[in-house]
């Protein structure tokens, strides 16, 4: 070690465990002259120089102390050349320069150190910065010592563990080798015993007599450890491996002793180690390959490595384990479909065995092939496992079947749906109740969206759902009827019962909800409420005035007449129904409408039917999921919670769900994502199955095109809300015929984007925007690609324009008009003209340029046009009945006397849907 006073001491213990230290790296401090009497202490790393050759080492003459009268001045020790260690029988080893030189060098060592200590001149005291640098360097050195000590302890512990493992492996190999030798002894029993014993007896003296030291061609350094066999008894085992500790300590001792000539100190010679016998081929194959052992062997080929030995042991261990291995029977969970590879993993069987079993059953499959649950169950049972079949739809279990706590049930507001025919005043009636004006904001004066509102009457809340009355919005009316408690059927007193009125009655009956009839527009002179009541009887709606149980109220939305009576009738019906809900449970409900807002993202209008919905909860709505970011009521205010029968807008969904989907609150995001992915995958599978069913094979497609000639009108539809998209698609489906139909390439809620333009360009489709517009990028892309974008805000106009465009795809109707018949009397062959038929018109007339058919024996031989029509030698336009004429066909001359010529006119008429 090196201290700050440059006092170097050398400790050479007899035996010390080899540890990892920085090789030749120490830290020291030097003083740097900064000029003008200033100095600076700098911490540097010093590296010891180790000579590689004996002649490189320069002997250092020690400083002789002052002579004493009793003892003569010591003589400086001269550096000795490195001598090879000689193995002696007694295990003793002598080194030149015995104990006397040791005593002399030992007694003179303190005097040499005292004389070698440098005596510098102190220029000035250290500054505070220099003291701090020294203190910091000292602390860093101490910290490094602690880390190195910890590292040495860890290395020592790891080395002990490895040594124990190696000893255990050697014991196992020794046992295996003993078994192999015993087997070999039985085989070689016929050989003479003396010959068998001669081999090991002759090997041992040879190994003992082998010279231990071995010189090399190049000069070796004094610090290099002489290569010799270990002297420890355990190292002389049959394997012939030297232990790492002794060899390392020996080399370390020699290395430490290499600097003895410089200090004039001699270390006691180590005892000589006996020579080791040469390793056999089997021992070399089992031994560990190192650089030292590889250089020590004399020309023998290198054997197996340690990794090869470990692989052999592992293979032997596996073979032993497989012999006594017992089959483990498991419970295998089988979904609806599973791959063979996954099935084999769940059974802990090899996929090859499963493939072999299937081959025996006559099925050639690969590990990646998908099989159904029935075949998977057969395979699992055949391999002895028990089967538990599950369905993918099990992920939806427990969402909507939660039971309500009877003790927590409280009264809730009724949900009322306004239904009826278009333009019968449904929205106007609701506006009069809400004291709002929604009708003025509706395009065309008709409702094209489903809306939900909540009003309060005498301290009681009532939730109203306004549904469209147009024929295109059948699905909306059906959803409104399913999510409601009471249906208010609005019938105009001047228009009576209409088709959508009948449809609304059927929806209410199918949903099993009571009906309250509101006879509107009684302020008109032509109003006839009694006629309305009588017509309702035909559809099994019996009002109270006719002896039934259905409440009816005559109202006027325009003059706001009897609106309070209508609300009282609704509250009376709700009291009869005794509507209750549990607000403490998790929320469930129905999606009334969904849209994609540019600033807020996906927005869903929902009706909470059970429980209480709060911001921050995770919900699943259809195939979409999300965390509720905000709740907005019908007035546009943010609310902290939504109780039963309360309509709110939800922000935070990942996408726009379909109108009519049910939503529920789930416990965590993973469950919500799992349910959403399952539903999306199910929707994709259905779409693929639908397309596959429509597409069929190539032969079916060609036959359909040849027979039916079906033409498609591709469209990309974007609307403001999901319900409008649904209504538009339903209306366009009704326009389709056997020859032409509308094909919706893509539909969705939201503005027209650049991706829609790309899709329309790829499919050669037109783009329809309903209450939405295209952004600037989409408009630029459409102009560049030549894609037409049509904007609409009334569904009537949209359907009419698409109908007209689809009519243009219809092939025109071919209408044929019979003109007359002519009989060929004689055929003339005229030069430069060809054959000309002399005919007499026997029926109707014959016109020039009309279509003709040549009929022979009641069989049509040719169909074409007339080339010439002459009466005598003059060209005429037509020949009436009873007159004779000459006719020639275009590109046809196979005419004979007695044939009949049929003349007709063809007209093409444009068709409409």
Swiss-Prot record:
One CC-aspect GO term: cytosol
Region of interest (G3), ranges: 466-469
Domain (tr-type G) ranges: 411-578
Gene: infB
Role description: One of the essential components for the initiation of protein synthesis. Protects formylmethionyl-tRNA from spontaneous hydrolysis and promotes its binding to the 30S ribosomal subunits. Also involved in the hydrolysis of GTP during the formation of the 70S ribosomal complex.
Keyword Transmembrane helix: no
Name of this chain's protein: Translation initiation factor IF-2
Compositional bias of kind Basic and acidic residues: 131-180
Region ranges (G5): 556-558
Region called G4, residue ranges: 520-523
Keywords, in A-Z order: Cytoplasm, GTP-binding, Initiation factor, Nucleotide-binding, Protein biosynthesis
Biased composition regions of type Low complexity, renumbered to the chain: 60-113, 181-195, 203-238, 261-277
Location in or out of the cell: Cytoplasm
Pfam families registered for this protein in UniProt: EF-G_D2, GTP_EFTU, GTP_EFTU_D2, IF-2, IF2_assoc, IF2_N
Molecular functions per Gene Ontology: GTP binding; GTPase activity; guanosine tetraphosphate binding; translation initiation factor activity
Entry binding sites for GTP: 420-427, 466-470, 520-523
Chief location: cytoplasm
């Amino acid at each position: 070690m090196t201290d700050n006073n440059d006092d170097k001491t050398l400790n050479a213990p007899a035996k010390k465990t080899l540890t990892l230290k920085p090789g030749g790296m120490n830290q020291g401090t030097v003083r740097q002259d900064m000029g003008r009497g200033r100095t600076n202490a700098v911490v540097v790393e010093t590296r010891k120089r180790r000579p590689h050759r004996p002649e490189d080492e320069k002997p250092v003459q020690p400083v002789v102390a002052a002579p004493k009268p009793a003892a003569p001045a010591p003589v400086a020790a001269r550096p000795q050349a490195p001598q090879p260690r000689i193995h002696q029988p007694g295990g003793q080893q002598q080194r030149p320069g015995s104990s006397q030189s040791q005593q002399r060098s030992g007694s003179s060592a303190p005097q040499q150190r005292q004389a070698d200590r440098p005596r510098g001149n102190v220029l000035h005291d250290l500054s505070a910065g220099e003291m701090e640098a020294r203190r910091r360097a000292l602390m860093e050195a101490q910290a490094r010592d602690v880390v190195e000590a910890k590292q040495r302890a860890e290395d020592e512990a790891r080395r002990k563990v490895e040594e124990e493992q190696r000893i255990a492996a050697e014991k196992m190999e020794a046992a295996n080798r003993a078994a192999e030798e015993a087997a070999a002894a039985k085989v070689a029993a016929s050989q003479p015993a003396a010959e068998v014993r001669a081999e090991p007896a002759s090997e041992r003296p040879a190994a003992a007599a082998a010279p231990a030291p071995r010189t090399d061609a190049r000069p070796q350094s004094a610090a290099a450890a002489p290569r010799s066999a270990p002297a420890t008894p355990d190292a002389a085992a049959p394997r012939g491996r030297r232990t790492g500790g002794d060899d390392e300590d020996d080399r370390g001792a020699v290395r430490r002793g290499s600097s003895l000539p410089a200090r004039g100190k001699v270390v006691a010679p180590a005892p000589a180690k006996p020579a080791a016998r040469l390793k056999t081929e089997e021992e070399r194959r089992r031994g560990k390959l190192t650089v030292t052992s590889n250089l020590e062997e004399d020309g023998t080929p290198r054997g197996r490595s340690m990794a090869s030995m470990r692989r052999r042991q592992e293979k032997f261990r596996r073979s032993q384990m497989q012999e006594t291995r017992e089959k483990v029977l498991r419970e295998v969970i089988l979904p609806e479909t599973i791959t063979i590879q996954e099935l084999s993993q769940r059974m802990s069987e090899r996929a090859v065995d499963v493939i072999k079993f299937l081959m025996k059953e006559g099925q050639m499959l690969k590990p990646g092939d998908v099989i159904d649950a029935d075949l998977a169950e057969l395979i699992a049972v055949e391999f002895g496992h028990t089967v538990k079949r599950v369905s993918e739809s099990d992920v939806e279990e427990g969402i909507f079947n939660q039971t309500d706590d009877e003790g927590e049930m409280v009264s809730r507001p009724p949900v009322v749906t306004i239904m009826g025919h278009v333009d019968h005043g449904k929205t106007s009636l609701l506006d009069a109740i809400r004291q709002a004006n929604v009708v003025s904001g509706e395009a065309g004066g008709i409702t094209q969206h489903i809306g939900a509102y909540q009003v309060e009457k005498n301290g009681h809340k009532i939730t109203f759902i306004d549904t469209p009355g147009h024929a295109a919005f059948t699905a909306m009316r059906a959803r409104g009827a399913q999510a409601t408690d009471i249906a208010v059927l609005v019938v105009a007193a001047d228009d009576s019962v209409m088709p959508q009125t009948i449809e609304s009655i059927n929806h209410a009956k199918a949903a099993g909800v009571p009906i309250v009839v509101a006879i509107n527009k009684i302020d008109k002179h032509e109003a006839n409420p009694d006629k309305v009541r009588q017509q309702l009887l035909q559809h099994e709606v019996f009002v109270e005035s006719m002896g039934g149980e259905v409440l009816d109220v005559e109202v006027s939305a325009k003059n706001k007449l009897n609106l309070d009576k209508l609300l009282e009738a609704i509250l009376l019906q709700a009291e009869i129904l005794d509507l209750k809900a549990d607000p403490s449970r998790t929320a469930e409900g129905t999606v009334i409408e969904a849209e994609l807002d540019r600033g807020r993202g996906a927005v869903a209008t929902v009706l909470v039917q059970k429980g209480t919905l709060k911001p921050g909860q995770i919900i699943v709505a259809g195939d979409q999921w999300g965390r509720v970011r905000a709740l907005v009521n019908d007035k546009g205010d943010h609310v902290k919670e939504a109780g039963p029968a309360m309509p709110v807008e939800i922000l935070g969904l990942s996408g726009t769900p379909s109108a009519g989907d049910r939503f529920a609150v789930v416990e965590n995001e993973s469950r919500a994502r799992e349910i959403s992915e399952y539903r999306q995958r199910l929707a994709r599978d259905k779409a693929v199955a639908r397309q596959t069913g429509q597409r069929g094979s190539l032969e079916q497609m060609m036959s359909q095109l040849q027979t039916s000639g079906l033409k498609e009108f591709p469209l990309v539809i974007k609307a403001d809300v999901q319900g409008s998209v649904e209504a538009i698609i339903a209306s366009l489906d009704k326009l389709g015929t056997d020859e032409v139909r509308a094909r919706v390439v893509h539909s969705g809620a939201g503005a027209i984007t650049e991706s829609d333009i790309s899709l329309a360009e790829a499919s050669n489709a037109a783009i329809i925007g309903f209450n939405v517009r295209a952004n600037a990028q989409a408009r630029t892309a459409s102009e560049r690609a030549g894609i037409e974008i049509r904007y609409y805000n009334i569904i009537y106009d949209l359907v009419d324009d698409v109908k007209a465009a689809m009519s243009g795809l219809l092939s025109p109707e071919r209408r044929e008009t019979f003109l007359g018949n002519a009989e060929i009397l004689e055929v003339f062959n005229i030069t430069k003209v060809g054959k000309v038929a002399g005919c007499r018109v026997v029926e109707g007339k014959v016109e020039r340029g009309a279509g003709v058919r040549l009929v022979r024996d009641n069989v049509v031989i040719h169909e074409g046009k007339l080339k010439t029509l002459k009466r005598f030698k003059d060209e005429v336009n037509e020949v009436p009945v009873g007159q004779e004429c000459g006719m020639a066909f275009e590109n046809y001359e196979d005419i004979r006397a007695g044939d009949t010529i049929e003349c007709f006119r063809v007209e093409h008429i444009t068709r409409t849907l």
